[in-house]
């Protein structure tokens, strides 16, 4: 079930990231540090398969500390079975996406649980995956175009817990009605796009 926004009962924002640790670059950590400095008392919850390794945890702790994120504001969550993993999304107010390799399945699962993801769009097909998912889900305002906007949007959303709560309560139904979760509608639209591209290709090759 979709939970209420945790910030309403805690009094502070909890950002989350459920991506593979290899996706978490120093540049990204620098932006997270900027966000947490701008949002007092906020916390960061990181869940990743690699956190079962003490070596991985130690390495990540060192990087976080070096880049300006206080370790007492960070929670490390171990990988979990699917049901427990989805339930764990009730612990975060919204997710901070990685870049240039954003989430895919993790973003969709979070949307289903009422949790939006803030993503940073890039120039390659893969780097625009988060942008594509969120735009189709009706959340284009959760797409940043550069690091500065990524930080600014995170701070802006953090200052409006009531808005986040309203979004959380309606998000599952919103995405359920979008092409993202409507397989037949998605397939129809995809097929129409392919046919349109085919006709365009034929027209370009036709004798003038």
Regions found by a protein language model. Name each.
Residues 94, 98-183:
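Catalytic binding pocket for nucleotide-activated donors in carbohydrate/polymer assembly enzymes
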Residues 1-15, 23, 27, 37:
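Nucleotide-sugar donor-binding and catalytic loop/hinge architecture
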Residues 81-92, 112:
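Short acidic alpha-helix that forms the nucleotide-activated donor recognition element
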